Every structure is written in structure tokens, then in C-alpha cells.
Amino acid sequence: AKTDPPIHFASLXRS
């Protein structure tokens, strides 16, 4: 979550 890369957050958004 905190250490997760920006790609992860980007995917969430997309979802």
C-alpha cells in the first residue's frame, strides 16, 4: 500500500 508502486494505485483507479 504505502511501499507499493504507483502502478498499483493506477490500476485501482482504472478498475
From Swiss-Prot:
Q: Which GO terms describe its molecular function?
A: amygdalin beta-glucosidase activity
- Domain of life, source organism: Eukaryota
Coiled coil regions in record = none
Q: What's this protein's name?
A: Amygdalin beta-glucosidase I'
| Keyword list, A-Z | Glycoprotein, Glycosidase, Hydrolase
Cite the record's note on assembly: Monomer.
Record PTM? Glycosylated.
Cite the EC number. Answer: 3.2.1.117
Q: Which reaction does it catalyse?
A: (R)-amygdalin + H2O = (R)-prunasin + D-glucose
